[in-house]
């Protein structure tokens, strides 16, 4: 049995707001830490039957980047759920929700840009 290690470094400002996020993992093959503007980590606590989460984003992450991040995360969550369950009908629903979410975001951005 082998052990993989994931390391996450979060630098915060004086108000404890993330200024930078860097991560590394033993199995990636990358020589140096990778920069990220956001992260979502979830752990399942079987005893409590609850998800434990760490959601962080840096102060310089733009709203459009956040929408892209959420869209891609929702799509990959659907793929993961599909691989685990083979419940393709629910996978399709999750992906449709993600597409609708992203479409509504784009429409909102267009409206807000017109108003300016």
Q: Where on the chain are the PLM-derived regions?
A:
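Intrinsically disordered, low-complexity linkers and terminal tails enriched in Pro/Gly
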Residues: 1, 30-33, 110-116
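Active-site- and interface-proximal helix/loop "cap" or "latch" segments in soluble metabolic
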Residues: 19-86
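Structured beta-strand/loop patches that form or line metal/cofactor-binding pockets in enzymes
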Residues: 1-10
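C-terminal charged interaction modules
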Residues: 79-116
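Acidic surface patches and DE-rich sequence motifs
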Residues: 13
């Amino acid at each position: 049995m082998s052990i993989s290690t994931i390391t996450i470094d979060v630098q915060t400002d004086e108000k404890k707001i993330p200024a930078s996020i860097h991560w590394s993992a033993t199995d990636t093959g990358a020589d140096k830490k990778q920069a990220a503007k956001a992260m979502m980590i979830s752990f399942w606590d079987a005893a409590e039957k609850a998800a434990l989460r760490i959601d962080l984003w840096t102060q310089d992450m733009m709203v459009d980047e956040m929408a892209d991040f959420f869209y891609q995360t929702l799509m990959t969550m659907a793929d993961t759920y599909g691989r685990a369950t083979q419940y393709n009908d629910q996978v399709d629903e999750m992906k449709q929700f993600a597409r609708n979410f992203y479409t509504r975001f784009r429409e909102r951005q267009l409206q807000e840009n017109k108003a300016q």
